[in-house]
């Protein structure tokens, strides 16, 4: 049975964004790339004027996996100011990283928004 907001617990998080409510979800990378393009070119009405943000990362925990990749768990906190309104968003996140020469590539990112009662459209720069 599909979970409805009215009968779900605020302590049970979305596991399947295709079937349950997810505040930000792109089926593939091209959707996210399109959103970034619209923001960079000024074609996204929701981002005029662009917000001022401050992103804080803490409690970083790194675990090397058997295949040489890394699983990185952390907590994040974003402070957001736009149109005379200040807001904050926060939660835990998990990254999967794979080595790429002298650097690392993000192969998966899962950010959980803990204060999910929002007053406006949520976008990726909030996370």
Describe each region flagged by the PLM.
Residues 123-127:
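Short hydrophobic/aromatic patches at helix-to-coil boundaries
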Residues 51-52, 85-87:
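Short Gly/Pro-enriched turn/cap motifs at secondary-structure boundaries
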Residues 6-73:
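A solvent-exposed, acidic/Ser-Thr-rich amphipathic alpha-helical stretch
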Residues 56, 77-85, 93:
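Charged, gly/pro-rich active-site loop segments
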Residues 71-73, 83, 90-122:
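Short beta-strand edge/turn micro-motifs at domain boundaries
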Residues 66, 76, 110:
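A broadly conserved detector of short glycine/acidic/proline-rich loop/turn motifs that flank catalytic sites
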Residues 1-5:
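Short, small-residue-biased leader/transition segments that mark boundaries at the very start
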Residues 63-65, 79-81, 98:
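A generic structural motif
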């Amino acid at each position: 049975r599909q979970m409805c907001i009215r009968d779900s617990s605020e302590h049970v998080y979305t596991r399947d964004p295709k079937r349950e409510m997810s505040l930000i979800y792109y089926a593939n990378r091209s959707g996210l790339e399109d959103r970034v393009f619209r923001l960079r070119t000024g074609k996204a009405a929701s981002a005029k004027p662009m917000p001022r943000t401050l992103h804080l990362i803490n409690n970083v925990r790194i675990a090397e996996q058997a295949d040489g990749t890394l699983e990185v768990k952390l907590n994040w906190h974003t402070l957001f100011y736009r149109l005379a309104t200040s807001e904050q968003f926060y939660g835990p996140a998990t990254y999967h990283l794979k080595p790429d020469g002298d650097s690392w590539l993000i192969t998966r990112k899962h950010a959980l928004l803990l204060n999910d009662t929002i007053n406006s459209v949520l976008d990726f720069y909030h996370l």
